[in-house]
């Protein structure tokens, strides 16, 4: 029964993405509640210090920033209470206003903010995700920072910190790779691909979703494997037009991995 429930949630997640392409993994300062009113409280985003320049790392591409002013920064799961049926999903709060719900190797992006209710002085947490955590909450943080209880309309959800999330796949053994593909590619319209020489691949679609894969190439085809509540396999045709890549019918220009990282972090 739990498996059927989870699959229905995932199906709805995929369908919902068709109408949420404008949401993005934003650094915006406010996450709107699903139903706002004129008396809605105002949250101010916790300030972070400017991040240091970092080298590109596929494993750390979506790693959250350390932010002492933001107790939500990190990876979490719903351990108890409302939404606990989604306990296999990982929730990522990146320390600068970007939220993601991660299913297997796929992430679906939204926004969040932490602040203070101007009328009551109560600490508030706003989050805009499709499932599990969506709305405006009061919250309390455990002494060790490993659990946060969020409350909305009298319903509690207990978030438990995840120290070692596993949504990035391990590199496959002896992958068959076309060396011309290796590197980062930009469509110029918000689609980014990265092909690693270790047989791992990454896609970011308009800042609304991201997916990690393992892949092989043969006869101008990429076979990409990823997990979303079970193993999925996609096949893509590709060719080259001069220095440009034509992948699945769309043209891409090669950029540095660091430039792709900068673009993704700007959402």
Regions found by a protein language model. Give the residues of each.
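N-terminal helix-cap/turn-to-beta initiation motif at the start of protein domains
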Residues: 56-77, 164-186, 267
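Post-signal peptide N-terminal segment of mature Sec-exported envelope proteins
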Residues: 33-68
